[in-house]
């Protein structure tokens, strides 16, 4: 299992476009990948789930991945969050 906490730095938070990018990245992996914010946890492969969280700038989020490719999934998601200027 891989787990990592991030701080959202994007001025718009995680809205439709970045949520889509995260879901696309997560969907490349077989692991179960969850996104947690404000006490709620959703499947990171679900665009509706991610959008339902309404994650603003400054929020602390946690991503967990469990499965055979969990480490690779976490590395890809960490890279995507950094490259897109979403979180650090």
UniProtKB/Swiss-Prot annotation:
Record keywords: Cytoplasm, Phosphoprotein, Phosphotransferase system, Sugar transport, Transcription, Transcription regulation, Transport
Record-linked CDD domains: PTS-HPr_like
Biological process annotations from GO: phosphoenolpyruvate-dependent sugar phosphotransferase system
One Pfam assignment: PTS-HPr
Organism of provenance: Geobacillus stearothermophilus
Boundaries of every HPr domain copy: 1-88
Record: active site: 15 (pros-phosphohistidine intermediate)
Gene Ontology CC terms: cytoplasm
Compartment annotation: Cytoplasm
Name used for this protein in its record: Phosphocarrier protein HPr
Tree of life domain: Bacteria
SUPFAM superfamilies assigned: HPr-like (SSF55594)
Modified residues (Phosphoserine): 12, 46
Modulation of this protein's activity: Phosphorylation on Ser-46 inhibits the phosphoryl transfer from enzyme I to HPr.
Family assignment from sequence similarity: Belongs to the HPr family.
Transmembrane segments: none
Function: General (non sugar-specific) component of the phosphoenolpyruvate-dependent sugar phosphotransferase system (sugar PTS). This major carbohydrate active-transport system catalyzes the phosphorylation of incoming sugar substrates concomitantly with their translocation across the cell membrane. The phosphoryl group from phosphoenolpyruvate (PEP) is transferred to the phosphoryl carrier protein HPr by enzyme I. Phospho-HPr then transfers it to the PTS EIIA domain. P-Ser-HPr interacts with the catabolite control protein A (CcpA), forming a complex that binds to DNA at the catabolite response elements cre, operator sites preceding a large number of catabolite-regulated genes. Thus, P-Ser-HPr is a corepressor in carbon catabolite repression (CCR), a mechanism that allows bacteria to coordinate and optimize the utilization of available carbon sources. P-Ser-HPr also plays a role in inducer exclusion, in which it probably interacts with several non-PTS permeases and inhibits their transport activity.
